[in-house]
């Protein structure tokens, strides 16, 4: 079989040069042929041989391409007129123009021929590359076949040897004594091998013991380094903790400089179908820094109808100016509003009670500000979902500093001075009256009996609670809104933080309150069956809002008695009001002129709150 394979090996010699094709030589003559219009072109002569065998393949490819011979370029034919006189410049110019045209046609024809030759050369090179690839493939297959043949030859030789061995074994069966002696020799050799192996194992054992001693000394060194690193880490932790405490102090100081009671005013945009306000009805004067300064003032005009009726003259306009911590015009987005209150999230995590109110008449956009609009549009999310997302994100970042936080949420409404659980589901609805009680005897912490307190750990769980509460909240049709909230909703999130390594704890409530619509009663209103319920609701709403104003004024005046118990709303929020809390009130007003009276009442109430100072907030730490 080896003799059969030898000719095949000889026949395949020299094939390795086929894949290497020198294409650089064909370009030179081709380009030179374009510059020499007379005589045969370089493409007609064919490529030169660059190898003994490999180049023949390229030559055959180029021959198969059947390159079209390029005809020698003809000189532009023109009639040579007689020499024109020197004064006939126009005629001379025509002759030169005609001659230039002929040369341009010749150049264009040569360019076309050059392009055709280049395309033919490219096709020839591609075919040569393909043939080289095919040759490499065939050589690989041939090598594989040779390897298989050699393996088969080896197996055949092994089988032949085995046959001879068996025949020899069968033929020497009578020489059993000699075979036993041979086996004895083999056993002796095996014993020697085992003894050698045992000595090797003993040497390896000694080497392992020496390595163990070396590793033990290295472990001692590493333990010393680890102890040094632990000490350094503890020092860095102490320094980081000191910086964190300083950050909290400066953050709280910054919030105190802004005011522990802050009032923002937001004007909702005009909705579709509503009349456009007259120019100058609502103005937003720029701050000291000009248009780049966020607005903090609002100017509202109002005509005195009574005076115009008496004088029979055009009603004069009275302008009312108000100043707040921040004013949001109708075009403000939810993201802009949230940016102004995002700093309070850190205050809640630091242990400061935080309370955010949304105040205003029915249809002024309070619920939209707090909860947003259902539908999943991120741009329309309210303060509650945005605040929860930011809260969980900051808590996750602070976990790297050793803080762990837990959150427990509740959502109740106060309807006609009755507390209702908005998170009640199924059979829990209506089971037992919800009352505000002390969590433990002697404790300042308040709790609502028969209300659900749900542990939450992510924003999706909070979104599910908001959706459930939105379905359970008391709404009714009013003159200003098709679905008006007729109750105060209070979303409470109890935040508990712990730093186990330092034994620090902080507990603080975060309250997001959507107050019911505030509007005055019309004394000339005819009461029907449904209007009596609306009247009772309005009286209860206005009474609780009035109590809220009295509580804030009492805290500002540092009175000895604060009337928390005059309303279920203030009684429930008493731990989030006062000197130990940070409060923010959103006053929402309508942009319509027909609601100017209610807008003025809301702005005046918010202006009184903005003038209150309740002292320095303190964190609830243990």
Swiss-Prot record:
GO cellular component terms, semicolon-separated? centrosome; early endosome; microtubule; midbody; nucleus; spindle
- Location within or outside the cell: Nucleus; Cytoplasm, Cytoskeleton, Microtubule organizing center, Centrosome; Cytoplasm, Cytoskeleton, Spindle; Early endosome
| The UniProt record lists the keyword Transit peptide | no
Query: Which positions bind ATP?
Result: 360-367
Keywords per UniProt: ATP-binding, Cell cycle, Cell division, Coiled coil, Cytoplasm, Cytoskeleton, Endosome, Microtubule, Mitosis, Motor protein, Nucleotide-binding, Nucleus, Phosphoprotein
Role of this protein: Minus end-directed microtubule-dependent motor required for bipolar spindle formation. May contribute to movement of early endocytic vesicles. Regulates cilium formation and structure.
Query: What is the protein name given in its UniProt record?
Result: Kinesin-like protein KIFC1
Specify residue ranges for compositional bias: Polar residues. Answer: 32-41
According to the UniProt record, which cysteines are disulfide-bonded?
none
Per the UniProt entry, what is one GO biological process? cell division
GO terms assigned for molecular function: ATP binding; microtubule binding; microtubule motor activity
**Modified residues annotated as Phosphothreonine in this record:** 309
Q: Which residues form a coiled coil?
A: 95-264
Oligomer and partners: Binds NUBP1 and NUBP2. Interacts with PPP1R42.
What the entry lists under InterPro entries is as follows: Kinesin-like_fam (IPR027640), Kinesin_motor_CS (IPR019821), Kinesin_motor_dom (IPR001752), Kinesin_motor_dom_sf (IPR036961), P-loop_NTPase (IPR027417)
Q: Where is this region: Disordered?
A: 1-88, 279-323
Q: Which family does it belong to?
A: Belongs to the TRAFAC class myosin-kinesin ATPase superfamily. Kinesin family. NCD subfamily.
Q: Identify the residues that the record assigns to the Kinesin motor domain, covering every copy.
A: 260-612
């Amino acid at each position: 079989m080896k003799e059969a394979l030898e000719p095949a090996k000889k026949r395949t010699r020299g094939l390795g040069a086929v894949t290497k094709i020198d294409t650089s030589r064909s370009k030179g003559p081709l380009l030179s042929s374009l510059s020499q219009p007379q005589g045969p072109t370089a493409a007609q002569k064919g490529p030169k041989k660059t190898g003994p065998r490999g180049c023949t393949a390229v030559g055959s490819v180029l021959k198969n391409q059947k390159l079209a011979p390029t005809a020698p370029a003809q000189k532009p034919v023109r009639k040579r007129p007689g020499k024109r006189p020197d004064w006939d410049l126009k005629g001379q110019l025509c002759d030169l123009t005609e001659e230039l045209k002929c040369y341009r046609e010749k150049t264009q024809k040569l360019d076309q021929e050059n392009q055709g030759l280049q395309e033919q050369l490219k096709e020839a090179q591609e075919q040569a590359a393909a043939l080289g690839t095919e040759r490499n493939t065939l050589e690989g297959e041939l090598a594989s076949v040779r390897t298989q043949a050699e393996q088969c030859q080896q197996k055949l030789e092994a089988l032949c040897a085995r046959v001879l061995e068996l025949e020899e074994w069968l033929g020497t069966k009578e020489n059993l004594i000699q075979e036993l002696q041979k086996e004895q020799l083999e056993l002796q050799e095996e014993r020697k091998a085992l003894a050698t192996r045992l000595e090797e194992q003993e040497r390896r054992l000694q080497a392992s013991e020496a390595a163990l001693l070396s590793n033990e000394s290295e472990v001692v060194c590493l333990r010393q380094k680890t102890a040094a690193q632990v000490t350094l880490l503890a020092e860095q932790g102490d320094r980081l903790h000191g910086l964190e405490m300083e950050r909290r102090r400066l953050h709280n100081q910054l919030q105190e400089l802004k005011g522990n009671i802050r009032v923002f005013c937001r004007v909702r945009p005009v909705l579709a179908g509503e009349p456009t306000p007259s120019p100058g009805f609502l103005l937003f004067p720029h701050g000291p820094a000009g248009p780049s300064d966020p607005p903090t003032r609002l100017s509202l005009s109002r005509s005195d109808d009574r005076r115009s009726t008496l004088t029979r003259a055009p009603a004069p306009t009275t302008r009312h100016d108000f100043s707040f911590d921040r004013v949001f015009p109708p075009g403000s987005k939810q993201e802009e509003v949230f940016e102004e209150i995002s700093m309070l999230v850190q205050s809640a995590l630091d242990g400061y009670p935080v309370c955010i109110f949304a105040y205003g008449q029915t249809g002024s956009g309070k619920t939209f500000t707090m909860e947003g609009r259902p539908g999943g549009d991120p741009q329309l999310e309210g303060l509650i979902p945005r605040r929860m997302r930011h809260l969980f994100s900051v808590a996750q970042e602070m976990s790297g500093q050793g803080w762990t936080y837990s959150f427990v949420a509740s959502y109740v409404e106060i309807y006609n001075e009755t507390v209702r659980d908005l998170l009640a589901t199924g059979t829990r609805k209506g089971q037992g009256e919800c009352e505000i009680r002390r969590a433990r005897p002697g404790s300042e912490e308040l709790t609502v009996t028969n209300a659900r307190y749900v542990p939450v750990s992510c924003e999706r769980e909070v979104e599910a609670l908001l959706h459930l509460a939105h379905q359970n909240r008391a709404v009714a049709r009013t003159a200003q809104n098709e679905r008006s909230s007729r109750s105060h909703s209070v979303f409470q999130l109890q935040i508990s933080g712990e730093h186990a390594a330092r034994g620090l704890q902080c507990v603080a409530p975060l309250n997001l309150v959507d107050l019911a619509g505030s509007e005055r009663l019309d004394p000339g209103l005819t009461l029907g069956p449904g209007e009596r319920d609306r009247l009772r609701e309005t009286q209860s709403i206005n009474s609780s809002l009035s109590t809220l104003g009295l509580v804030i004024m009492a805290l500002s005046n540092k009175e000895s008695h604060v009337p928390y118990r005059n309303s279920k709303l203030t009684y429930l929020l008493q731990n989030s009001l006062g000197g130990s809390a940070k409060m923010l009130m959103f006053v929402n007003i309508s942009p319509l002129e027909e609601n100017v009276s209610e807008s003025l009442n809301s702005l005046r109430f918010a202006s009184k709150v903005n003038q209150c100072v309740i002292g320095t907030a303190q964190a609830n730490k243990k």
